[in-house]
From Swiss-Prot:
Keywords: Aminoacyl-tRNA synthetase, ATP-binding, Cytoplasm, Ligase, Nucleotide-binding, Protein biosynthesis. NCBIfam families: gltX_bact. GO terms for molecular function: ATP binding; glutamate-tRNA ligase activity; tRNA binding; zinc ion binding. It is an enzyme of class 6 (ligase). It comes from Staphylococcus aureus (strain COL). Monomer. This is Glutamate--tRNA ligase. It is found in: Cytoplasm. A motif ('HIGH' region) lies at residues 11-21. Its EC number is 6.1.1.17. Catalyzes the attachment of glutamate to tRNA(Glu) in a two-step reaction: glutamate is first activated by ATP to form Glu-AMP and then transferred to the acceptor end of tRNA(Glu). InterPro entries: aa-tRNA-synth_I_cd-bd (IPR045462), aa-tRNA-synth_I_codon-bd_sub2 (IPR020751), aa-tRNA-synth_I_CS (IPR001412), aa_tRNA-synth_I_cd-bd_sf (IPR008925), Glu-tRNA-ligase_bac/mito (IPR004527), Glu/Gln-tRNA-synth (IPR000924), Glu/Gln-tRNA-synth_Ib_cat-dom (IPR020058), GluQ/Sye (IPR049940). GO terms for biological process: glutamyl-tRNA aminoacylation.
Length: 484
């Protein structure tokens, strides 16, 4: 194992980048960068049936969008390639042959039906299902007989008996497994493709991976991988298994859970900021010292400490994600947020597909109005409904405000002044409201609340003069005149 910190993120190109996998990649990235090490991306693409045509491209594209720059991968060979498992068979095969020659592995000719029957019988007896070793000591004659029947063998690793496999997990502490609870396991499938636990151990060794940091659903894989290291006399890497991510019901985040968007692509499409998502994901199962929760990527790299990875499940808090993204939204210049929001405004037919300069100017004013409130760029559409839809029926509280005895006088004065106002801009609108206040003697909530309710149908919202400007003179006058 190398003295240099070398970690890997090893996705399968079977789907889009999931939040859980993004967290695995992010923690590996922070760990590597904190120690001036290497962040490697390896593609585990041996499951051809499940691989998606654009699965690999999607992984790289979304990692890059998040700001996770890799040091080595299919596009950056640093002498440890190939970086796709499907291209490493020439590395695996001599090692498979070596294990067979040393009797550390053997061919198993049992059919899927026979294995399933064994499994069902074990479950019926209340036993933990595991392979019983029926083909562990076949004679040459028996092997020839099975092959004459056309049976394709898998290759199983011969698990040493009465042995304890222990490792010091950087998150969980010491973890031990009794080898007697692990049946001889398949290292090469009947189609000749190495299994995950065999290939990953080989790849980690030859790529000189120093630390394997992954989700704790991989804990049970670790003893099998250690067996491979020991079989070849290699030193295993250090292991760290991160806690699960759970939903509001404290259940493991499932891809079937419709309450939470779980793919990076979905957050991109909604108009979340990559640095905000990076920040949020970095706090899923890891915590800094102190109370601060907003950090740049560079700050995270500097303060990252693997000892602060949590043993407890990480709660995916949608409200917190919205808050974090809002913090970043407020820091951005309006033009950046507008460019993020523009596709959403066009998709909702609120701005033409080929907008004029006037349309764009209006859109920028709309964003400036709501930027401090927006949780994500796409939220501009529901936030700004009052600009495009008919006024909703007023609620009871709004009705009380608009029925105030001062309202007819207020609306008459305001309507008259706004009708004559040019230019119809927020600074002039603000002056006009002050003039109405002086002329009528109506002030405070008695002044502002009825105006807001009359033009927006809401009790609260952004700056009133700015809102009136963005609504436009025609719409504002139409809404005011019914209350004169």
């Amino acid at each position: 194992m190398s003295d240099r910190i070398r970690v890997r993120y090893a996705p399968s190109p079977t789907g889009y980048l999931h939040i859980g996998n993004a967290r695995t990649a992010l923690f590996n990235y922070l760990y590597a960068k904190h120690y001036n090490g290497d962040f490697v991306i390896r593609i585990e693409d041996t499951d051809k049936k499940r691989n998606l045509e654009d699965g690999e491209t999607s992984q790289f594209d979304n990692l890059k969008w998040l700001g996770l720059d890799w040091d080595e991968s299919v596009d950056k060979d640093n002498g440890y390639g190939p970086y796709r498992q499907s291209e490493r068979q020439h590395i695996y095969q001599p090692l498979i042959d070596q294990l067979l020659a040393e009797d550390k592995a053997y061919k198993c000719y049992m059919t899927e039906e026979e294995l399933e029957a064994e499994r069902e019988a074990q479950i019926a007896r209340g036993e933990m299902p595991r392979y019983g070793g029926q083909h562990a000591h076949l004679t040459e004659e028996q092997r020839q007989q099975f092959e004459a029947e056309g049976r394709q063998p898998s290759i199983r690793f011969r698990v040493p008996q009465n042995q304890t496999y222990s490792f010091d997990d950087m998150v969980k502490g010491n973890i031990s497994f009794d080898s007697n609870g692990i049946g001889d396991w398949v290292i090469v499938k009947k189609d000749g493709i190495p299994t995950y636990n065999f290939a990953v151990a080989i790849d980690d060794h030859y790529m000189q991976i120093s630390d394997v940091i992954r989700g704790d659903d991989h804990i049970s894989n670790t003893p099998k991988q250690i067996m491979i290291y020991e079989a070849f006399g290699w030193e295993p890497p250090r292991f760290g298994h991160m806690s699960l991510i759970v939903n509001e019901e404290r259940k493991k985040l499932s891809k079937r859970d419709g309450q939470i968007l779980q793919f990076i692509e979905q957050y991109r499409d909604l108009g979340y900021l990559p640095e905000a998502l990076f920040n949020f994901i970095a706090l899923l199962g890891w915590s800094p010292e102190g109370e601060e929760e907003i950090f740049s990527k560079e700050e995270f790299i500097k303060i990252f400490d693997e000892k602060r990875l949590s043993k407890s499940p990480a709660f995916f808090d949608k409200q917190k994600l919205a808050w974090v993204n809002n913090q970043y939204m407020k820091q951005k210049d309006t033009e950046t947020v507008f460019q993020l929001a523009l596709p959403h405004l066009i998709k909702a037919n609120l701005i033409p597909e080929v907008p004029s300069e006037e349309d764009l100017s209006w859109g920028r004013k709309l964003i400036a109005l709501y930027q401090k409130e927006m949780s994500y760029a796409g939220e501009i559409v529901p936030l700004s409904e009052m600009f495009f839809k008919e006024m909703p029926a007023l609620g009871e509280e709004e009705q009380q405000v608009i029925n105030g005895k001062q309202v007819p006088e207020l609306m008459t004065h305001l309507f008259s002044k706004l009708e004559a106002l040019e230019p119809f801009e927020s600074a002039e609108i603000k002056k006009t409201i002050k003039e109405v206040q002086k002329e009528t003697g109506i002030k405070g909530k008695q002044l502002f609340m009825p105006i807001r309710v009359a033009v927006t149908g809401q009790m609260h919202g952004p700056e009133l003069p700015n809102t009136i400007e963005v609504l436009g003179k025609e719409k504002v006058l139409n809404r005011l005149k019914q209350y004169k």
